[in-house]
């Protein structure tokens, strides 16, 4: 199993609530519909609690069956079909602050 992690920050013009609503209700379904080979897609939204502040606005996680599926995603990302999703990301994510990480999962505990 291969996982992609995307650490995202919102555009400064958006409130936290606007950003999270758009990401979950608009962008999430679009990504699920357009990204080929997607096994699982999760959005991690920050917990609102007194005293908690974060330097990021969320983490996206995408699961891939194998390295070939991930490679196909990279190829797709350069295609005409991906432009709609990429343009949508630019609407609400500060792309200059996005950090991407790709990893092979090794489960240590799974209760």
Question: Where in the sequence are the language-model features?
Answer:
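Macromolecular interaction modules
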Residues: 1-111
């Amino acid at each position: 199993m291969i996982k992609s992690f995307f650490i995202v920050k919102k555009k400064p013009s958006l409130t936290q609530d606007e950003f999270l609503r758009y990401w979950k209700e608009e962008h999430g379904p679009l990504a699920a519909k357009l990204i080929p080979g997607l096994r699982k897609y999760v959005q991690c939204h920050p917990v609102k609690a007194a005293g908690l502040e974060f330097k990021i606005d969320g983490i996206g996680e995408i699961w891939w069956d194998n390295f070939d599926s991930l490679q196909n995603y990279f190829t797709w990302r350069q295609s005409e079909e991906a432009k709609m999703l990429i343009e949508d990301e630019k609407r609400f994510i500060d792309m200059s602050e996005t950090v991407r990480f790709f990893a092979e999962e090794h489960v240590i505990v799974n209760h």
